[in-house]
Amino acid sequence: MTNLNYQQTHFVMSAPDIRHLPSDTGIEVAFAGRSNAGKSSALNTLTNQKSLARTSKTPGRTQLINLFEVADGKRLVDLPGYGYAEVPEEMKRKWQRALGEYLEKRQSLQGLVVLMDIRHPLKDLDQQMIEWAVDSNIAVLVLLTKADKLASGARKAQLNMVREAVLAFNGDVQVETFSSLKKQGVDKLRQKLDTWFSEMQPVEETQDGE
């Protein structure tokens, strides 16, 4: 297993939907979460960069798929935040279509990190993201963010509750606590990413039956 240097991660491009992404080769790991789950902060903590992923005081502002390259052919994908109440319904549907299309069709997608506020985990859209991933045979790491907001006992109780709940998905779903502020859970996140980035990809199909 390769230990990648996530501090070398750099922004590549933004895309409004899957059709505007670069060629479907290499390995991608996607980050998804509700608009206030701390996704941008987690990416910045992972890479030890203060502004790699733009954090916003306005939830729902990140409407694009953002790609970051860790190493040649190895990318992190920041998916649009979902579930923000004040976003118009039409825009919500558009985001959900883009998310579902990416999870179902992107061949280079190796793993999905779903971030949830530890105080409010497993909302409907969180569960839908996990379900989409499991249905597409994609491994999932659930990060219960803002873990520093709870005392140790409450933190463990939430962790155990979510671990029990995700068994119902019958998929490869791991759950860990995470705090960008305290740098808690960063090592486990890096270990999981290293594993996913080290896995062999299936041989690409040739065109025209060649």
Swiss-Prot record:
Keywords: Cell cycle, Cell division, GTP-binding, Magnesium, Metal-binding, Nucleotide-binding, Septation. GTP binds at residues 33-40, 60-64, 78-81, 145-148, 178-180. Necessary for normal cell division and for the maintenance of normal septation. Depletion of this protein leads to a severe reduction in growth rate and to extensive filamentation, with a block beyond the stage of segregation. Essential for bacteria survival. SUPFAM superfamilies: P-loop containing nucleoside triphosphate hydrolases (SSF52540). Belongs to the TRAFAC class TrmE-Era-EngA-EngB-Septin-like GTPase superfamily. EngB GTPase family. It holds the Pfam family MMR_HSR1. One of its GO terms (biological process) is division septum assembly. InterPro entries: G_ENGB_dom, GTP-bd, GTP-bd_ribosome_bio_YsxC, P-loop_NTPase. The gene is engB. One of its GO terms (cellular component) is cytosol. Residues 25-199 form the EngB-type G domain. The lineage of its organism: Bacteria, Pseudomonadati, Pseudomonadota, Gammaproteobacteria, Enterobacterales. Its cofactor is Mg(2+). This is Probable GTP-binding protein EngB.
